Structure formats: C-alpha cells, structure tokens
UniProtKB/Swiss-Prot annotation:
The protein's role, per its UniProt record: Succinyl-CoA synthetase functions in the citric acid cycle (TCA), coupling the hydrolysis of succinyl-CoA to the synthesis of either ATP or GTP and thus represents the only step of substrate-level phosphorylation in the TCA. The beta subunit provides nucleotide specificity of the enzyme and binds the substrate succinate, while the binding sites for coenzyme A and phosphate are found in the alpha subunit.
Amino-acid positions noted as binding substrate in the UniProt annotation, renumbered to this chain: N264, G321, I322, V323
Cited PROSITE patterns: ATP_GRASP (PS50975), SUCCINYL_COA_LIG_3 (PS01217)
Manner of cofactor binding, per the entry note: Binds 1 Mg(2+) ion per subunit.
An example molecular function term from Gene Ontology annotations: succinate-CoA ligase (GDP-forming) activity
InterPro entries, per the entry: ATP-grasp, ATP-grasp_succ-CoA_synth-type, ATP_grasp_subdomain_1, Succ-CoA_synthase_bsu_CS, SUCC_ACL_C, Succ_CoA_ligase-like_bsu, Succinyl-CoA_synth-like
Cofactor(s) required for function per UniProt: Mg(2+)
Family as reported in the entry's similarity comment: Belongs to the succinate/malate CoA ligase beta subunit family.
Record keyword GTP-binding present: no
Organism: Xylella fastidiosa (strain Temecula1 / ATCC 700964)
Protein name as it appears in the record: Succinate--CoA ligase [ADP-forming] subunit beta
Xref: NCBIfam families: PRK00696.1, sucCoAbeta
Amino acid sequence: MNFHEYQAKQLFAEYGIPVPAGRIASSADEAVTAAKSLGNGPWMVKAQIHAGGRGKAGGVKFCKTTDEVKQAAATMLGTKMATYQSAGVALPVNLVLVTEAGEITKELYLSVLVDRGTRSITYIASSEGGVDIEHVAAETPEKIQTLNVDFVEGLQPYQGRDIGFHLGLEAKQVNQLSKIMISLYQLFNDKDLSLIELNPLAILSNGDLYALDGKINSDDNATFRHKELAAMRDKTQEDETEVLASENDLNYVTMDGNIGCMVNGAGLAMATMDVIKLNGGEPANFLDVGGGATKERVTTAFKLILSSNKVKAIFVNIFGGIVRCDMIAEGIIAAVKEVGVKVPVIVRLEGTNVDAGKQLLATSGLAIIPADDINDGAKKAVAAVTV
C-alpha cells in the first residue's frame, strides 16, 4: 500500500525522525490558515498524490507570502496531476501539505528497503539527494553507500555512524544520522513496511538533519495486523477496478493489452501472461481468482475484466486442485449469461472433475471455445483478437 507524504511524515514524527512542521489543507483558504499557524514564512505548498516527481509537474511551490500560498493551493487542488513516476496516470489532488521552508545547505538521500538478492533489510545512502537515485547509481555510483543489516543482530549505531562518515558529514550530523537510521529500522519492522525513502534528507542552515520529503510503502500481506495503516488508505489514488477487486478478495492488476485473463493461482496467472506474450498477444490484466473461487467470484471477475473496453477476448485458465473444474464451469456459464459477454471466451480446464466441467461447457449452448492446454488456449485467444 502506498501513502501520502504527509502520512509518511506523521509516522516519522512518531518515531523521533525530524520533519518540518506542517499541516494539510483541502482548500486554498485552509492552506492560508495552515501557513499562518506555522509562522511568518516562507512556506512550501506540496500536492499530495501517490507519485514522486511532483516538482517538475508543478506540484511543489515555494511561497514567501500567504497570497502566494493561496494561489499555489488553488492552482493544485481539484486538478489531476501526472508525473514521470505516475505511469502516465493523472492522479487527483485532493489535499496539499503546507510546511515550513527551511534554508537548505546540503541534500542527502537515504532509503530502507527489502533486498531480495541478499535477503536482508538494506539501507541505501548518498551524498547526492533531491534527485533520482537511479541517475546517481548510473552516473556516479561511487557516491552511493549500501548497508545490508544482519537479521539477528539488527542495525547497530556504529553502522549508521560509518555511513555518516562516508557521506562526509560532521560529527554532530553523523550522530544524528545514526539515530535516524535506527528509528527508521524500528519503524520499518514495527509497521511491516517494504520501502522508506527520505529524498531529500537535508542539512539545514543550523547544521541539523531533517526529512524534507518522505515516501513509504507497506506490505499488503501484513495489512490485517495494522489497522492504523489500513485507515490511511486513499482509494482515490488507486485504479478503480483494482479497488473493486480487492474489496471482493480478488488479486487484479490492470495492464495495457486486449486479452483478458482469469486464472487461479498467481504463478499460473503470470505463466499465462507469459505464454500469451510468447504467442504474440498482449494481456489486459493479471487476475488471480484464488484457490477458493466460487461462482459469485467468477461472475465478479468477468465484470472486472469487461470493465475495460480494450478487452477483445478472455482466456480462462483453471487448474483444479483445491477448486473443482465443474464448479468453475458453472460459474463461467452463469457469468457469461448474467454479464452478457460479447467477446470470445477461451477456457482451459485441468484437474479435479475436469471431464464434468468440460461437459457442462460443451452442453451450455454458449459460444465458449475449449482449449486443450495453456499454449493452445493462448494461441486461440491471440487468434480471436487478430481476426
């Protein structure tokens, strides 16, 4: 799950990580009130969307007067903003964050993430902050420091200090960085996060470190034990179809192709998309109906797939282990009748009660195209959209 900057900073503050004072606003007048409550300025006004790169899209403004604050907020609120990190999707700006604007002397980069390669929580730090870390890694990799944390020992203070010295920080800043890193480690583990990014982690004119911008992602699989994080979810920033899918316990991801996919099991779903690509097609979605698929869930899955007008065919690929093929067949028949599917439906069934399932489809009177295996199904789906 993704979070807004202001939500990330709330969590940072709870764990003692220095952040500039700030308030959120949903109108230009509220933004002015927020600015006045923070002092005499200057201020930063920042659009709150689930994407980085807001500055280049006009979503971050430096303001010296409350009139400028009002103008900046009015320009952002109620609009949709696309950045180079939003994958071409324009996200609604419903809130702005108004913060104190400190005098920056140096910008650093610091992040915490799960490194699957080393199977560890890993820190990435750089003396080049305020820019994309990917560019730094490509152009000046010597300016990046990495630290893989031993799972048993956890992060030790000396490791944070070592990073600080390599970044060229002064003694006071080295100790501050070490404390920030330890706090981030605790936050990361306490909340089951998958990413924390401070960019920039700035040195202000008083010599202190502050997290001027922050990004966090949490592990969706752990949301059930973090109701306080679930309450922060902003569905307006998410794909409407994916939100509906999650509400129905379906794992759905929108893609750019024209062949809808309905599969049980994430691994088989990914393999299905691969085989479609291998045969020259483009999947329109990833959709895992799960091992406990019911007729109702299959019907909902069809509705989700057909919510996109790009879908020209649907490939249903089911391996009946836990789920029975005859039950899936009943669900497919009911869904096709209820939804009124107008595009070709290709079905491959294998596993428990497969013969009964195929018989139900064959005698349904519906124009359902049977497939012998995954490759045959993919070929027929590709052929259906290229007619």
